[in-house]
């Protein structure tokens, strides 16, 4: 999909960027790769997830990641630590996993309790096992287009755009949000794909005017339906990385009702970005296992 085709997209004909369907398709490919690793090395790719405390939402996310591992034949090592865990104790556990040759990827579930230095703990993860793309070194290497595992949500979004043959070069992209694991890496990945990128945030003046000129809009700000449908430029590609539970299921950071009559393509909520985030984590763990085995 080129700039010209985006501009000429007929009303009501927006492509649904179905992350759930694509993730299922990729899982079949990953299962084959996992089987090949087992056959050639006698070892099973494994992802270690660390959950500190008893936050219900975090526990749900960790369980979903474990289920995804199981579906492709990987091992899932679940490490649970109490809320009172110190930064030093958590870093020691990460070191233990770094030094375990049977662990190919490490995920520290965000957020950790407030008294823990989360950034220091992220930085403790060995770059070769940073399959969630959370280290500063990994971010820097990605930004400089060197080999590294990308932060999973933006990397999953890029996979989704690539799958739908959306040509990014030359597009005006607006990323709303500047978090270390979503907004900033998303902007850098789009820049590396030759987009002209604007990052908006809580201090941005006149957000609407920025959205109205964007060929690609990425909602990554964590505020329910902050970005209104009538701000969207005709033919734009709309990516909603937010999720906020409601009585009717959930909404994202973008008001999606009516977007199908404006955009050329958009991600549904749920079923768009979320499945691709977990899928990318699993894919990058398989990549790490193959590299570890020299395959």
Curated annotation (Swiss-Prot):
It catalyses: (6R)-5,10-methylene-5,6,7,8-tetrahydrofolate + NADP(+) = (6R)-5,10-methenyltetrahydrofolate + NADPH; (6R)-5,10-methenyltetrahydrofolate + H2O = (6R)-10-formyltetrahydrofolate + H(+). The keyword NADP applies. Its EC number is 1.5.1.5, 3.5.4.9. One of its GO terms (molecular function) is methylenetetrahydrofolate dehydrogenase (NADP+) activity. GO terms for cellular component: cytosol. NADP(+) binds at residues 177-179, 202. Pathway: One-carbon metabolism; tetrahydrofolate interconversion. Keywords: Amino-acid biosynthesis, Histidine biosynthesis, Hydrolase, Methionine biosynthesis, Multifunctional enzyme, NADP, One-carbon metabolism, Oxidoreductase, Purine biosynthesis. Pfam families: THF_DHG_CYH (PF00763), THF_DHG_CYH_C (PF02882). Homodimer. Catalyzes the oxidation of 5,10-methylenetetrahydrofolate to 5,10-methenyltetrahydrofolate and then the hydrolysis of 5,10-methenyltetrahydrofolate to 10-formyltetrahydrofolate. This is Bifunctional protein FolD. It comes from Psychrobacter arcticus (strain DSM 17307 / VKM B-2377 / 273-4). The gene is folD.
């Amino acid at each position: 999909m080129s700039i010209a085709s985006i501009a000429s997209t007929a009303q009501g004909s927006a492509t649904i960027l179905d992350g759930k369907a694509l993730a299922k398709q990729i899982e079949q490919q990953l299962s084959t790769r996992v089987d090949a690793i087992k056959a050639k090395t006698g070892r099973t790719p494994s992802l270690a997830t660390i959950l500190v405390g008893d936050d219900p939402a975090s526990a749900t996310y960790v369980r979903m990641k474990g289920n995804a591992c199981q579906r492709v034949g990987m091992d899932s090592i679940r490490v649970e630590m109490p809320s009172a865990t110190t930064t030093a104790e958590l870093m020691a556990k990460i070191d233990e996993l770094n030094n375990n040759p049977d662990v190919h990827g490490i995920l520290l579930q965000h957020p950790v309790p407030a008294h823990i230095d989360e950034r220091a703990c992220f930085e403790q993860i060995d770059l070769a096992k940073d399959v969630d793309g959370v280290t500063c070194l990994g971010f820097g290497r990605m930004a400089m287009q060197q080999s590294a595992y990308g932060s999973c949500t933006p990397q999953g979004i890029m996979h989704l755009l690539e799958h739908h043959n959306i040509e990014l070069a030359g597009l005006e992209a607006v990323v709303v949000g500047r978090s270390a694991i979503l907004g900033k890496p998303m902007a850098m990945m789009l820049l590396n794909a030759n987009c002209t990128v604007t990052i908006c945030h809580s201090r941005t003046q006149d957000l609407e005017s920025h959205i109205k000129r964007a060929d690609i809009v990425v909602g990554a700000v964590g505020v329910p339906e902050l970005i209104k449908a009538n701000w969207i430029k005709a033919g734009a590609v709309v990516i909603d990385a937010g999720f906020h539970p409601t009585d009717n299921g959930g909404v994202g950071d973008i008001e999606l009702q009516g977007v199908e009559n404006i955009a050329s393509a958009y991600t549904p909520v749920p079923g768009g970005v979320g499945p691709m985030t977990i899928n990318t984590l699993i894919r990058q763990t398989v990549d790490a296992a193959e590299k570890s085995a020299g395959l």
